[in-house]
């Protein structure tokens, strides 16, 4: 079996975790107490869903997941919520005082007290796996726990499970709305620390998702539940091929092979279609071509940036539901003829396709309509450098005045870490810029220097 362990860190990670596991349970017909009436082989399991759930002798299905937060309130909601019986109490780990939006507290002072306990619990989950494939880590860039503790944990996972892949689902600070003033600091410190430990990081920006909820689902004031359910759908699409049998299946390492041309360029953009409310879906039937085109609309992306200003390096289309390869090929052929979508010249083909016959499931009473087919596109584009540039700019404005730095230094960090992290991100921006340059031009430029 190719099992995956999900690790949900901090408030954002835990709340997205709630949305994801709620959806997985619905998709597989697992009840909130872990029973699965449709599963006939009790205790034994090489069913596809065993990549995400382990089975006990009593026929109970337990998520292969760990929820960690440095303060208890958010995880307490899981402990008392609908799915409280689904998780083993040891999978829900909390500290006593939170990281207070401070990377240094999450990474050094408070994080280090709890990290060994967390690794111990992860080890227990890993021992239940026959062929552990890797880790999915859910966290935000802006919070103290999400930035500091997640990066500490990833460093330690690299030591303990060297070759296992680590994929991140990271909540990127929104351009306009902010939950903390020091988000740029935390984001840049955590990106610098995890850059070498993460194999692939899917970024999600709250504001982009707010806009999708407002525009496509007609929700005037989206709540985090609305956002997380939408993020849950995306995560579900990405992991569907690991949990179901499909026609063209994709596993974790396959994503990296197809999406990551260079180790540092590992931040694909996710786009999901169709995001549509029940009232609208009732009146229209969306074809494969329509949902495929929708993926190339910047409005449907999970991060605010414009791929029309950048170049695509790779593209992964993950379809689910009533989709046949013939339609997909036709849709992609049409897209390739459009001039708005530019690929880098060293990567001519660039489309990888996965098809899963399991139609998308929606949470009953949620905002999303039940549709026959959906697609999630993961694309590695140079446009995401815009997102980094935006963040770096905010970092520079604050750091020029050394604003708020004393909070970090007081927790045992050194100022040098800030400048080191900032230089690393400057290098990352440069990397993206160089990747997008045409290879012929690049050779000509190099020739002049010698």
Curated annotation (Swiss-Prot):
Q: What EC number(s) would the UniProt record show? A: 3.6.5.-
Catalyzes what? GTP + H2O = GDP + phosphate + H(+)
Query: Which SMART domains would you find in this protein's record?
Result: Tubulin, Tubulin_C
What is the active site of this protein? 254
Sorted UniProt keywords: Acetylation, Cell projection, Cilium, Cytoplasm, Cytoskeleton, Flagellum, GTP-binding, Hydrolase, Magnesium, Metal-binding, Methylation, Microtubule, Nitration, Nucleotide-binding, Phosphoprotein
Quaternary structure per UniProt?
Dimer of alpha and beta chains. A typical microtubule is a hollow water-filled tube with an outer diameter of 25 nm and an inner diameter of 15 nM. Alpha-beta heterodimers associate head-to-tail to form protofilaments running lengthwise along the microtubule wall with the beta-tubulin subunit facing the microtubule plus end conferring a structural polarity. Microtubules usually have 13 protofilaments but different protofilament numbers can be found in some organisms and specialized cells. Component of sperm flagellar doublet microtubules.
PANTHER family in UniProt: TUBULIN (PTHR11588)
Q: What does this protein do?
A: Tubulin is the major constituent of microtubules, a cylinder consisting of laterally associated linear protofilaments composed of alpha- and beta-tubulin heterodimers. Microtubules grow by the addition of GTP-tubulin dimers to the microtubule end, where a stabilizing cap forms. Below the cap, tubulin dimers are in GDP-bound state, owing to GTPase activity of alpha-tubulin.
**What protein name is recorded for this chain?**
Tubulin alpha-3 chain
